Amino acid sequence: MANLYNAEGYFSPTEHEAFTRIEKEERAAAKAAAFRPIVYICSPYAGDVERNTENARRYSRFAVEQHCVPITPHIYFTQFMNDNIPDERDIAIFMNWVLMSKCAELWVFGTIISKGMQAEIDRAKRKHMRIRYFTEEMEECK
């Protein structure tokens, strides 16, 4: 903490002000470094489920490496819900929307946009979310 008096004991408001600003900037930088936005991972699931699940894991890991918290519902919900049962799929889609509402951004991976992905993209647009597009190799499309 900055002291109002210098090392020799004299009143030094300028020095105090400078050190106070430096400390404030250091606290802000530390807080910013600790912040990790939540991002919704949008990628194919149906079709080649095994390959698409592995890709979703890679995309989630990529988000972590980019200092984000990934939300990848098609990895999580498929552990206890059956995508082939229409009622369960509808419930899962609803839960996807709930999770998406907590996210700062939607990250879309790959060149093939499935029907489910398009629904997620459309919803993100309606909610004015930032949408970022990436290749399967995790390079951002500009």
Segment roles from a protein language model:
Residues 1-142:
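Catalytic phosphate/metal-binding cores of nucleic-acid and nucleotide-processing enzymes, i.e., regions
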